[in-house]
Amino acid sequence: MAQLYFRYGTMNSGKSIEILKVAYNYEEQGKPVVLLTSRLDDRDEVGYISSRIGMRRKAYPIGNDTDIFDYIDDISPRPYCVLIDEAQFLTRANVYDLARIVDELDIPVMAFGLKNDFQNNLFEGSKYLLLLSDKIEEIKTICHYCSRKATMVLRMEDGEPVYEGVQVQIGGHESYISVCRKHWFNPPRERIVPLKQN
């Protein structure tokens, strides 16, 4: 029986490499998958899932107006799994489409994304995935400043932490640092530096 999975983690926790690994494992067995990503994510190129280690795959870009259920229902032959990157950017309607794909088409759906934003609020997509998913799994990484588990994202502008502003600001190493709760509230000022670019 198919299930809806939500695998969440902070920035730089390996979500994109995990989605590419899952796709590879299915396809190695001759089982086609569908890769989806947010139309908002243009860090590399719209319509691609890219990992920090250099792997990338083409994916269908979805937006607020995309009927994901109809898109998947029209694919023949049916995919064995639907994989979604940047799932935090999904809308409530998008997430309900994913639940319908699982329940009505009996296709497993795995959504990967951030849980909370830089203000420590849930993203809309993450909120509804937490409510509707059959399985919720955390992809872990460590704090930029210590060895604790990173659970939050710190937005940086000109070397300073930012706690106010628009929720969605597409960025990577230059804009966001994964931190533990302690260092989200009190980042060590003398050690605030953006992550190195590869």
Curated annotation (Swiss-Prot):
Keywords: ATP-binding, Cytoplasm, DNA synthesis, Kinase, Metal-binding, Nucleotide-binding, Transferase, Zinc
Domain of life assignment: Bacteria
Compartments, as annotated in UniProt: Cytoplasm
ATP-binding listed as a keyword: yes
Substrates-to-products reaction catalysed: thymidine + ATP = dTMP + ADP + H(+)
First-tier enzyme category under EC: transferase
Annotated HAMAP family: Thymidine_kinase
GO cellular component annotations of the record: cytosol
PROSITE patterns: TK_CELLULAR_TYPE (PS00603)
Family classification: Belongs to the thymidine kinase family.
Gene Ontology MF term list: ATP binding; thymidine kinase activity; zinc ion binding
GO biological process: DNA biosynthetic process; thymidine metabolic process
InterPro entries, per the entry: P-loop_NTPase, Thymidine_kinase, Thymidine_kinase_CS
Record protein name field: Thymidine kinase
Gene: tdk
Active-site annotation: E86 (proton acceptor)
Binding site for ATP: G9, T10, M11, N12, S13, G14, K15, S16, D85, E86, A87, Q88
Signal peptide range: none
Protein's organism: Streptococcus thermophilus (strain ATCC BAA-250 / LMG 18311)
